[in-house]
Every structure is written in structure tokens, then in C-alpha cells.
């Protein structure tokens, strides 16, 4: 599988995206695509093409949900709300395309209880696949500056593992993690 993971792999004119995807599919032994993107970088025109692509090759579209909490999404400057994620996931899944999501446990302002609360909301989404990430603070970013000025709670490794387990226990059982 060719994995278009980094950045927003649907943020370009459709003809450019088609060239990229078709070029990847032309490589020997590439049997399908996994396209990671943002929920606010999807259009009906692109979904039409992805539906056609899905009819002739293996395809997964993954969305960076990150959180279901709109306050958190604003805090981390995502530029979209949770409803945007819900819509994009539904529109993609309803076209028969395998649909994935990415969430981050431990975002600023989200404690263990908040993360666990979100599992049932994520379970209600039309997701086939879910990837769970830990919070990463990268030097030179706005989040790193914020943390240096006013540190917020970070999970210890044991707290993160316990939170993941509790989250998974509440997640819909047919979602591939």
C-alpha cells in the first residue's frame, strides 16, 4: 500500500491529486492507497473520484479527528470543529470507502476522564479503523511554547497505558485499532 500520511493529502487541485494517486498505483507491487487528510480538506468532487478509485483498488481514507471536544480543537488551532469530522467520515463511509480516524489522548485540557468520555462518541462515528496517538510536543511549535510558559499535565507512560485500556474497553468492538 502507498501511504499518503504526512500533511493533508487532499489539499491540492483534483487534477494534481489524481496524478499523485495514479502515479503511486502505477508502481509495481502497490495494491492500494491509504490517504491521510483533514476533515476540512474534502469535497464532493474529490469524494466522487475516491469512490471511483475505490471501485478499482484497495482504498482507506483516514481523518485527523484528534478530539471530539470543540474547546480542545480551538485550543490546538485545528481550524475545524468535531461536526466537520463527523460529516467527512459519514460522507466517505457512505460511499463504501473504508474510513479511518486518528485521535490523540492527553491533549491540553483533556484528562483521563475526558478521554474516556470521548470513546463512546468516537464509537458512534462510521469508522472502520481508529489510530490512537499519544500527545507529542515538538520543539519550536506553538504548543511547545505554551508548555514552556505554563506547563500542563502530561500523562506518565503508565497513565497513558491505563487511559488507552479504559478507552479501548469503551470503544465499539468492530473498529479495527
Task: List the model feature ranges, each with a label.
Residues 31, 57, 150, 174-175:
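Secondary-structure boundary/capping positions in well-ordered alpha/beta enzyme cores
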Residues 71-82, 146-154:
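Glycine-rich tight-turn/loop motif centered on a GG-T
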Residues 3-6, 104, 148:
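Short linear capping/connector segments at secondary-structure termini
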Residues 51-53, 80, 118-120, 148-150:
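Short, hinge-like loop/turn segments at secondary-structure boundaries
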Residues 16-21, 156-164:
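Well-ordered, non-membrane alpha-helical segments in soluble/globular domains
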Residues 1-80, 87-88, 94:
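Conserved SAM/AdoMet-binding glycine-rich loop
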Residues 83-142, 158-176:
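Conserved C-terminal portion of the radical SAM core fold
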Amino acid at each position: 500500500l502507498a501511504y499518503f500520511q504526512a500533511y493533508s493529502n487532499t489539499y491540492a487541485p483534483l487534477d494534481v491529486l489524481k496524478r499523485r494517486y495514479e502515479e503511486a498505483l502505477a508502481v509495481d507491487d502497490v495494491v492500494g492507497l491509504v490517504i491521510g487528510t483533514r476533515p476540512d480538506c474534502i469535497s464532493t468532487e474529490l469524494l466522487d473520484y475516491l469512490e471511483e478509485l475505490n471501485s478499482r483498488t484497495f482504498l482507506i481514507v483516514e481523518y485527523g479527528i484528534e478530539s471530539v471536544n470543540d474547546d480542545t480543537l480551538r485550543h490546538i488551532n485545528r481550524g475545524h470543529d468535531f461536526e466537520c469530522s463527523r460529516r467527512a467520515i459519514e460522507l466517505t463511509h457512505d460511499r463504501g470507502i473504508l474510513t479511518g480516524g486518528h485521535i490523540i489522548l492527553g491533549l491540553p485540557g483533556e484528562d483521563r476522564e475526558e478521554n474516556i468520555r470521548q470513546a463512546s462518541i468516537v464509537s458512534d462515528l462510521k469508522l472502520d479503523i481508529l489510530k490512537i496517538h499519544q500527545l507529542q510536543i515538538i520543539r519550536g511549535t506553538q504548543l511547545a511554547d505554551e508548555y514552556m510558559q505554563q506547563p500542563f499535565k502530561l500523562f506518565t507512560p503508565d497513565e497513558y497505558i491505563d487511559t488507552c485500556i479504559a478507552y479501548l474497553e469503551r470503544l465499539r468492538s468492530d473498529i479495527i485499532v
